[in-house]
Amino acid sequence: MKVLMINGSPHLNGCTARALKEVADALAAQDIESQIINVGNKDIRGCIGCNYCCEHGKCVFNDLVNETAPLFEKAQGLIVGTPVYYAHANGGVLSFLDRLFYSTSFSKVMKVGATVVSSRRAGSTSAFDDINKYFTICGMPIASSTYWNEVHGFTAEDVEKDLEGLQTMRHLGLSVAYLIKSIALGRERFGDLQLPVEARTHFIR
């Protein structure tokens, strides 16, 4: 069992990375493997709406998005970490997720999703909501914790002082692991959840 983790911060060893490490350690203690993909330090362009992916099964821009797609398909969970910029998620990680989710046709139903946000002070809950939208449109259950999944600080050293934030990350790791294992057991007994999309309208037509 494996979880793919996205670090949306340009700082590879910053606050977001520190939070994700705490989650990864909790997952490892539950025998769940994790792999981190660093996105925030990459030049990721946004979707241009060309629909190349609809015909070819991959994004027209052959970059980290296409490299990540098969890893996402094989993973049982996806955890996205982002710093908070002006009360929203990092623009680069949003561009990455737009293209990753839109260009991949494989089912994401029952893959566990979770968001981790890092802020110096405020704006974290709206950034948290930004990322969760990707999960809820795809039938992905969202793992929660004992507080909103956030840490506070300006440096990774600051995050070490956020004892409740780190506790929240550990609890999130346990929650993700529990959901993944429970869904696996459910599949053994009940099979895959089928959600056929038979209607697709533009509001009314």
Regions of interest found by a model, annotated:
Residues 42-72, 199-205:
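Cysteine-cluster motifs in flexible loop/terminal segments that predominantly coordinate metals
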Residues 32-42:
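A short beta-strand-loop structural module common to alpha/beta enzyme folds
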Residues 25-32, 77, 101-105, 136-140, ...:
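Generic secondary-structure signature for well-ordered alpha-helical cores
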Residues 141-205:
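Glycine-rich phosphate/pyrophosphate-binding loop and the adjoining helix
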Residues 55-147:
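Helix-loop-strand module that forms the ligand-binding subsite of alpha/beta enzymes
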